[in-house]
């Protein structure tokens, strides 16, 4: 059980949350655009002030590790590393696609016990970063950079219901065009949803080396590779 500060900057949304023993006690979000360089420091200062005013020891910092916006992720990870160095806290990495799945699993969808869930992040044009999970958040297929067409997820769709969500999902639905394909709207990676994932990793002792931790990227698109240079 721990006090964990979580940082999420993988998309245009910037968010910071503080959880204590897995329960969120502070949440800050900015949905106005890619303002991480401006907003993240303000949110972190507010979170640290909140923790310190209550004499709660900060034991770990969790950060979204990708895939996602390369610039946004770098800003978030740099902040997380700085906090870990300054506070002597542990560093926890949370994969963005796993984080995206949390509100879907905790919400009304999917209803079917054998349904599969596919979080997607936009990688431009008809390419997405995607991963396939079951309802217990067990990996069915690892992260891939998919160029989506009617056949991409057919093997899963032919078995039963599959729920697609994230900022890469809507553009793919017309192409997928299958009766078992369902779109879950308005799902974003948010720091407040890191709480159960970060707490689990803390209990299991799954920490990153602060000095050598790297972002998670799988087969980035040419545009992403150009941006990262």
State where each predicted segment sits:
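DPxDG-like acidic metal-binding loop motif
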Residues: 62-96
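Surface "functional belts" at beta-alpha junctions
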Residues: 23, 35, 90-189
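Residues at secondary-structure transition points
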Residues: 31-42, 70, 74, 78, ...
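N-terminal beta-alpha supersecondary unit
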Residues: 1-67
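Conserved small/polar residues in nucleotide/adenosyl-binding loops
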Residues: 217-226
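Stable alpha-helical structural segments in soluble proteins, enriched in small hydrophobic residues
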Residues: 47-51, 86, 104, 194-201
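Phosphate-handling active-site elements
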Residues: 51-56, 85-94, 112
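Glycine-rich phosphate-binding/hydrolytic loop that grips phosphoryl groups
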Residues: 184-216
